[in-house]
Amino acid sequence: MNQSIALAKAGIHVFHAGLIGEEGKLLLDECRKYGVDTTFIRQLPQKGGHTMIQVDQNGQNSIILYGGTNQMQTEEYIDEVLAHFEEGDFLILQNEINKLDYLIDRAYAQGMKIVLNPSPFDEKLSACDLNKIYLFLLNEIEGEQFTGCKNPDDILEKLNDKYPKAKIVLTLGGNGSV
């Protein structure tokens, strides 16, 4: 949601899709307040997914995740949403939903440009063909988890070697990004 709102504030026409829980009206209201199109959001009678991010005095974060409705995506729902988009459209994903591998495969087959923020980094990513990613947007901790390297230059080098077609933005906490 934060990425959708930030893009909408920058003047981009943004559609946000996903499954929200019974308490999700606040999320819908926030998105709509900033001009995010919520046509493809579906509300379910279960608890929604949510994330708590703790940031220390050095700008480093720790993420606590409850999957909720974010883990209830179906292939039918994904196909229904993707049917409204076309080649060249951007799809921004985080690793907070199920069926990520299916979504990446389908969007790529349609010619969409896939931007992936692999947060939270976990084993689900190994099921995804990450060669289909147009742009990785990750922090240095996720970069280390991907590559085993701590140095930002080494992280970028390894990621560029492994995914030569992808663009990479590596955020460095309080030190900006590269």
Model-assigned labels for residue ranges:
Residues Y77-V81, K99-Y102, E123-S126, D154-I155:
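Short acidic active-site motifs
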Residues M1-H50:
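Substrate-binding N-lobe of the ribokinase-like
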Residues H16, I41-Q43, I53-F90:
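Conserved phosphate-binding/catalytic loop of the ribokinase/pfkB sugar-kinase fold
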Residues I5, H50-Q54, S62, G176-V178:
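Short beta-strand scaffold segments in enzyme catalytic cores
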Residues Y108-V115, S119-V178:
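Conserved phosphate/ATP/ADP-binding segment of small-molecule kinases
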Residues E86, D101-I114:
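Glycosyltransferases and closely related glycan-assembly transferases
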